[in-house]
Each structure stands twice: as structure tokens, then as C-alpha cells.
């Protein structure tokens, strides 16, 4: 069973969304480690390392995710983790264009960025595709190493 880390980053205390996501991802066959609300970057990273997670799913609804996520990808890399990272929610105060917001978070290193109206099934299908693609890449990489 694939493990994902889920939580609300920073000072955000919105719990309903991650509860819905936790149940949806579990129903889809994932092992979900739910950090709850007001989680720090290091809590996500430590949990991903401890549970050998394949993905980190970050939620934020209070509009300050950009500040909360500065340096997150760098810390993930420094920890030596190879994880897929998603973020979703109401990520920016007064966001004019979600495309601009998406580009901001892609530049911060997130693999996928979702708005607050995204159906959980969309994120689940995206993660299955991303992890499936990743498994194929790892398998072919291992074959190359074995054949060398």
C-alpha cells in the first residue's frame, strides 16, 4: 500500500478539507498519515522519511501558503527524499488568476497545484498516474543498473 503524508501547513487551522481528503485517499487504497493542522515543513519531511512515503499532500485555505512553503522543496531535497508533492486549497489572498498561482507554486517545486474547488477524485487520479509513471521510471532505471 502506498503511503502519503497529508496536512495543513503553517498557521492554518482548517481541518474539514483534510478530513475529506484523508477519507477519499484511504478509500482509494492509500495509507494516509494525517498530520492535522498547523503543521510545519519539518513535520511533513520527518513524517515522509519515517513512513517511507511516496507523496506529500499539503493543504492550505487561509491564503498564506506561499510564505509557508518557501524553501520546502529545498528541505525535501536536503533530507534526501524522493517524493511527489501536491498542494491545494485557497493558496493566495486575493488571487486574481489561478494560473498565476499555479505557476508560483510550480516554481516553489510542487509537482501539482489544485484550487479549493478541486474534487478529491481528480487529485487521487493524478497521484495514481504520477506514482504509476514514477514506478515505471524506477523499474527501467533498475533494469539499466542491473544490466550494466
UniProtKB/Swiss-Prot annotation:
Q: Where is the B12-binding domain?
A: 1-134
Its EC number(s): 5.4.99.1
Q: Which domain of life is it from?
A: Archaea
Q: Indicate which residues the UniProt annotation says bind adenosylcob(III)alamin.
A: 11-15, 59-61, 90-94
Q: Quick one: a GO biological-process term for this protein?
A: anaerobic glutamate catabolic process
Q: Where is the composition biased (Basic and acidic residues)?
A: 129-141
What reaction does this catalyse?
(2S,3S)-3-methyl-L-aspartate = L-glutamate
**Any GO MF annotation of the entry:** metal ion binding
What Pfam families does this protein's entry cite?
A: B12-binding
The cofactors named for this UniProt entry are:
adenosylcob(III)alamin
Q: Which UniProt keywords apply?
A: Cobalamin, Cobalt, Isomerase, Metal-binding
Which HAMAP family does the UniProt entry name for this protein?
Answer: Me_Asp_mutase_S
Question: Subunit notes for this chain?
Answer: Heterotetramer composed of 2 epsilon subunits (GlmE) and 2 sigma subunits (GlmS). GlmE exists as a homodimer and GlmS as a monomer.
Q: Which family does it belong to?
A: Belongs to the methylaspartate mutase GlmS subunit family.
| Protein name (database record) | Glutamate mutase sigma subunit 2
Organism per entry = Haloarcula marismortui (strain ATCC 43049 / DSM 3752 / JCM 8966 / VKM B-1809)
Phylogenetic classification of the source organism = Archaea, Methanobacteriati, Methanobacteriota, Stenosarchaea group, Halobacteria
Amino acid at each position: 500500500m502506498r503511503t502519503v503524508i497529508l496536512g495543513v501547513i503553517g498557521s492554518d487551522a482548517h481541518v474539514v478539507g483534510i478530513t475529506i481528503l484523508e477519507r477519499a485517499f484511504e478509500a482509494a487504497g492509500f495509507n494516509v498519515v494525517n498530520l492535522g493542522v498547523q503543521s510545519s515543513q519539518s513535520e511533513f519531511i520527518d513524517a515522509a522519511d519515517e513512513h517511507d512515503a511516496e507523496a506529500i499532500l499539503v493543504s492550505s485555505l487561509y491564503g498564506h501558503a506561499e510564505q509557508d512553503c518557501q524553501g520546502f522543496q529545498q528541505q525535501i531535497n536536503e533530507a534526501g527524499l524522493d517524493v511527489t508533492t501536491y498542494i491545494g486549497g485557497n493558496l493566495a489572498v486575493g488571487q486574481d488568476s489561478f494560473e498565476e498561482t499555479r505557476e508560483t507554486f510550480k516554481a516553489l517545486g510542487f509537482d501539482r497545484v489544485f484550487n479549493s474547488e478541486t474534487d478529491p477524485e481528480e487529485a487521487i487520479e493524478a497521484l495514481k498516474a504520477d506514482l504509476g509513471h514514477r514506478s515505471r521510471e524506477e523499474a527501467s532505471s533498475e533494469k539499466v543498473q542491473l544490466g550494466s
